Every structure is written in C-alpha cells, then in structure tokens.
Amino acid sequence: MPYSPGVESASVEGIWQALKVFRGAGIDEGKLRIKSMKGLKRTVRKYGEVVGHRTGVAGTELLPYEQARRRIYLPSYRWVLENRLADLVTELRETSAERDIVLLDYTTNSQVEDLTKPLSHAALLRAHLAGEWPWTV
C-alpha cells in the first residue's frame, strides 16, 4: 500500500476509501479489510466534503484529488495487476495477440486529470495490456 509499508488491503478500492478524508471524518482503516465490496464506499452525504486523501495510514499529508489518483490509486492498481493478477494479465495479452477482446465498463474516462468522472477500469487495463501505462506522479 503506498505510503504504508507492511500494510495490506483486500482491494484497491479499499485503499482509496480508507485514505479518503472528509471534513467530518478521518481515514477508516476498516475499509482495508473488506473483501465483499459491501459497505466499502464513504460518501459526502454521510461524512461531508472530501478534503483529500491521506498519504498512508500514518501519513500527515493530504493530497488533492488528482494527486491522490496519481500517487495512491494508480500505483495500487498497477501493483495488483503486476503482482496479484499477473497470470490473468498474461492470458489476456496472449488472447489479444490472437483476436480482439472487448473490455466493458460503466465509465469510459481514461484521463486522470478529468475529475468529473471516475476512472475507467477498462481503460486502465487496456493501457497496461498494451504496455502504455502513462500515468506517473
């Protein structure tokens, strides 16, 4: 987990939600343990305005949304693809070399700087499969 050596999460979304800081609530380490994806989201309706994402569970820096995407979400996502899903990624790469594959998603936003919409998981996976992971800090 970025900025938290030795700390693990059951999901990338768990990291994202756990490190989200609201005007009315700090981080929530319990989100790191959720495997079912139920009760994972933390919303402005319940906690108030998002003020940033903490740099790790013991961090003191708050990152604005785009920087949090670049420094927390994208490295976490890529780590999972390379370390937990490497066999599946290899299989997808091999299949895509033989024929077209279709990746479906609810969103199509592939622009990290477009903060009006969530990032597309399909776009992130496509970029990774193509060896075109362009997102850096």
Feature locations, PLM:
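Charged, low-complexity intrinsically disordered segments
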Residues: M1-V137
